[in-house]
Amino acid sequence: MFALAAVLASLAGCMTAGSQPAALSTYANPVLDSDFPDPAILRGPDGFFYVYATQGPYEGGMLNIQAARSRDLVHWQRLGDALPVKPSWASRTQDFWAPHVHHADGRYLLYYSAKPDAALTDPSRGLCLAVAVSDRPEGPFTDMGRPLQCGESFINIDPMAYDDPATGRRLLYWGSGFGPIKVQELAPDRTSFAPGSRPVELLHVNSSDTPDNYQRLIEGAWVIRRDGYYYLFYSGDNCCGPNAHYAAMVARSRSATGPFETMAAATGAGNSVILGARGNWLAPGHNSVTEDAAGDHWLLYHAVDTRRPRTRASDDINSRRIMLLDRLRWRDGWPYVEVGGPSTGPEPAPAAGFGPRR
């Protein structure tokens, strides 16, 4: 598998801006073999899939918001830093996490979280939600000059913007830090919350100590609509380090703002996990979802390769989370991954191109 992954990585690095890779019959994980946590996908108007990731090292430097693009979800071309200039209120910190880019009203909005400079002298200050804007999907994005919302610890992270096709409302999902996953309506400018709106709590943590409980911490919200249901994908419980224990889960609702029912509550399963550890892949999760040209759904997510779990040998805390891809299937109104975890060998490749929007 390493040999095939190396070939794919080489091909991805050689792609030019207008190149179209040959159609694939199979692929193998990983699809991007470098630290690329919390991947969030966007379908661009130029025929490319764009993906954005948490701050990470690349070619001897540190990228605040990582970005890459692909025509087929397998060959990825690195694009450098989508947020090359830090915001004025977070110019001296290094925590730029879990971006999501939303295309609306002729511009691209980058929702992300960052640690404010004030936190360097006041430990009670936690991460903030933020918004940056660009006229191109690859950036550069320019921060709006103020945080969207701040709070304690890391409860205000992992934003995902979503336009509800049923109501036309502009929504923002977010949450982590042992708190709930929430949603709140955005104002028409999409850079502030709608006047008078309040956050709605959708999912809550479960403090049980059972080994199969991944909801002691929940984060990484991603929403899609299918056959009259809104599916809220989320992850938990510990992404990183020597005690990493992480998986992707799902809940659903008839409304974008809930109430959501977890798969476990609906089916009686022991938990709501659709993607857990398998083989040499540890702590998979924080997924995004897209469709290929055949209309099949695909999960892009990060996982830790136990054969090379660290970005730096001396760093036992920050795991090397690389990007994987697997097909999402459906049964009885619920999504699942064929083997319950990351694929470990050649798999049928996505149909290159875009599927229908839902």
What is the predicted role of each segment?
Residues 2-13:
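Bacterial N-terminal signal peptides
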Residues 14-358:
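Carbohydrate-active catalytic/glycan-binding domains of CAZyme proteins
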